[in-house]
Amino acid sequence: MTVEIANESGVDVDELRLLDLARYVLDRMRIHPLAELSILLVDEGEMAVLHERWMDEPGPTDVLSFPMDELRPGRLDVEIDPDAEPAVLGDVVLCPAVAKQQARHAGHSTQDELELLTVHGILHLLGYDHAEEDAEREMFALQSELLTAWRADRRIAGRPGRKR
């Protein structure tokens, strides 16, 4: 999987953790190994511009997802086609400044919030949504499950702890 990250936000972020998390989620969701994903971290001004342009909403938001090729999660009982063409999953745009505010309210670190938003953004790229109550329950449960499993796997593997 090709996952690229660009931090244009001016905020110090543990980009390697976000890359590791994104790859983990794509693997767990059985997305073809040649799929491409881009993660962009921007400041509040840029996020406000994107939010208004694409969602017709004022002010910055925490995460925006821009799907490209229509990829969906694979099934565990079906092998991944090794001859399939690579596809671009899309872009996830994160705003660390907004994440910092949300993290303060949630009682955890900005990095924890950015990790949650990374999973959230990827799930949107895969077609998950939270416009309806049932869909929200499904998406948020999957989001929590993926994040919890990734953190547990990192602890078992002895990878470094969270950056605060």
Curated annotation (Swiss-Prot):
Pfam families: YbeY (PF02130). GO terms for biological process: rRNA processing. Disulfide bonds: none annotated. GO terms for cellular component: cytoplasm. Its EC number is 3.1.-.-. The keyword Repeat does not apply. Zn(2+) binds at residues 120, 124, 130. Binds 1 zinc ion. Keywords: Cytoplasm, Endonuclease, Hydrolase, Metal-binding, Nuclease, Ribosome biogenesis, rRNA processing, Zinc. It is found in: Cytoplasm. GO terms for molecular function: metalloendopeptidase activity; RNA endonuclease activity; zinc ion binding. PROSITE patterns: UPF0054 (PS01306). Single strand-specific metallo-endoribonuclease involved in late-stage 70S ribosome quality control and in maturation of the 3' terminus of the 16S rRNA. This is Endoribonuclease YbeY. It comes from Acidothermus cellulolyticus (strain ATCC 43068 / DSM 8971 / 11B).
